[in-house]
């Protein structure tokens, strides 16, 4: 069984989680979000299976994939923690529009073998989990910027 982690469950993170739940209902989804209401909604609606009370939750170390869907400063902070706890083969990705600073941090941390930067070209004028939609990424470009050592089988 694949385990997917989300740090940030707003419009984009929530939309990706909803799509994963729809197309891969057997996957185990964990999430952290600043808004406890969003987590409660995601849990009660069956989108996620587990709530992480903090972004540095050790359960993220059990994930096969971790989506960083928070503001870039928080994503940068999470990278160092994830480096210490991630299991072999875990792929970490982000959904931010800024790539230079996050790839610089990935290189500094020696994580070029497990990081795939991502930028979904989708969104809405609305924000938050309540406005997320499993179809928001349909027919949208999703630009990937993998680290230099990521195996092609992960892309």
Q: What is each residue range found by the language model?
A:
Residues 27, 49, 90, 113-114, ...:
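A structural micro-motif
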Residues 34-35, 70, 95:
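Short beta->alpha hinge that forms the Motif I/post-I loop of the SAM-binding pocket
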Residues 109-155:
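Rossmann-fold dinucleotide-binding core
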């Amino acid at each position: 069984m694949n385990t997917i982690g989300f740090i940030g469950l707003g419009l984009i993170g929530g939309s990706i989680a909803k799509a994963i739940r729809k197309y891969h209902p057997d996957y185990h989804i964990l999430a952290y979000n600043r808004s406890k209401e969003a987590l409660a909604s995601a849990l009660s609606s069956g989108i996620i299976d587990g709530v992480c009370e903090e972004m540095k939750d050790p359960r993220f170390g059990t994930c096969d994939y971790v989506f960083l869907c928070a503001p870039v400063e928080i994503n940068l902070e999470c990278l160092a923690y994830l480096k210490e706890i991630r299991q072999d083969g875990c792929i970490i990705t982000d959904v931010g529009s800024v790539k230079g600073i996050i790839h610089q941090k990935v290189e500094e941390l020696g994580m070029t073998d497990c990081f795939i930067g991502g930028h979904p070209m989708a969104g809405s004028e609305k924000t938050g989990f309540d406005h997320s939609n499993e179809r928001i990424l349909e027919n949208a470009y999703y630009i990937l910027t993998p680290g230099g050592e990521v195996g092609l089988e992960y892309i």
